[in-house]
Amino acid sequence: MTWFIDRRLNGKNKSTVNRQRFLRRYKAQIKQSISEAINKRSVTDVDSGESVSIPTDDISEPMFHQGRGGLRHRVHPGNDHFIQNDRIERPQGGGGGGSGSGQGQASQDGEGQDEFVFQISKDEYLDLLFEDLALPNLKKNQHRQLNEYKTHRAGFTSNGVPANISVVRSLQNSLARRTAMTAGKRRELHALETELETISKSEPAQLLEEERLRREIAELRAKIERVPFIDTFDLRYKNYEKRPEPSSQAVMFCLMDVSGSMDQATKDMAKRFYILLYLFLSRTYKNVEVVYIRHHTQAKEVDEHEFFYSQETGGTIVSNALKLMDEVVKERYDPGQWNIYAAQASDGDNWADDSPLCHEILAKKLLPVVRYYSYIEITRRAHQTLWREYEHLQATFDNFAMQHIRDQEDIYPVFRELFQKQSANQSA
């Protein structure tokens, strides 16, 4: 039996190259469709694939053709209605149908095409969703790069210490070597054994020939047995190499207001923002830690599940969350070794006497050590004292940004605005 092994890079997806070319060519239309679709999704369905529709006019291929109007002369074969030198009257109006965009009035004539709809995968969706986004002011910590390494497996080697020997790989090599070295002898042995069996059953007996065959069979078996079961050539050892640890370590603090003034719709919008942030971090960076803090009158560090699904609520004192963040930074995240980020979401409702304290904590303790601090206020009401205090911070600190979200449709544009990749001149 003949076996064919398909080693093409695309495997079963033989149109992958064409698909990638299509995505690159119509990236602007696809991203526009994705930005519209994300606002219609539920909080738990943000990271799945998406059906994308593109207007037919946007994907039509360019072609040369006669324009409408003008004066043209053509010669047609005659028939029972027209003879030589007859002229055909020009049709009245432009005629023709168009694409079904849903605009205009009904007509009994004309035809067109619906928008082109296709499905993109989860990976393609997330790549387009977070394209051109990055953590601002991300810097490398050079001393960690020079001093700390981590051991990783790196295949196999023919030399090493006995403790690292790979028994399975060594036995595989031994079997392959013995099979290659004895294959010819085994075929010859099988032929001699078959011949001996045939002669021993024949009449009259051929004693001398049988004796010769038995000697040759014994010699072949001895040669096969002399092939060593294991040889130093077969031995393989697990190989390890030291690689420098990634030099850009980062931690993101997520501070969410869960006080009684935050109704369910406002909390859902805050969660949607943080889910986008979590997907962006996990998709773009390999070694970013996330610290979740929920706060009302009290602040508490929680895990991911409790952050998104806990029903606990209460009054509003924002400064407690900032104090807790400061404590965690001092305890676990040295600013000299970590890039520290924070994203705070609130409806802006805070105890009036507490807002100046928030300004003081941020200005004196947090903003001097963080790379970037973003604040989003989710409300349709007028801004209150917390927003006004934060406006003073924005005017003073370049690493502080704030945005206002009124409706669900504002979440993704605000997210892109906060984490838009900076150019070289901007980062400088």
Curated annotation (Swiss-Prot):
Compositional bias, Basic and acidic residues, is annotated for 78-90
Q: What InterPro entries does this protein's entry cite?
A: UPF0229 (IPR006698)
Q: Where is this region: Disordered?
A: 78-111
Q: Return the Pfam families for the record.
A: DUF444
**Gly residues bias located where?**
92-103
Q: Which family does it belong to?
A: Belongs to the UPF0229 family.
Q: What protein does this entry describe? A: UPF0229 protein YeaH
Query: What organism is recorded for this protein?
Result: Salmonella paratyphi A (strain AKU_12601)
Q: Which gene encodes it?
A: yeaH
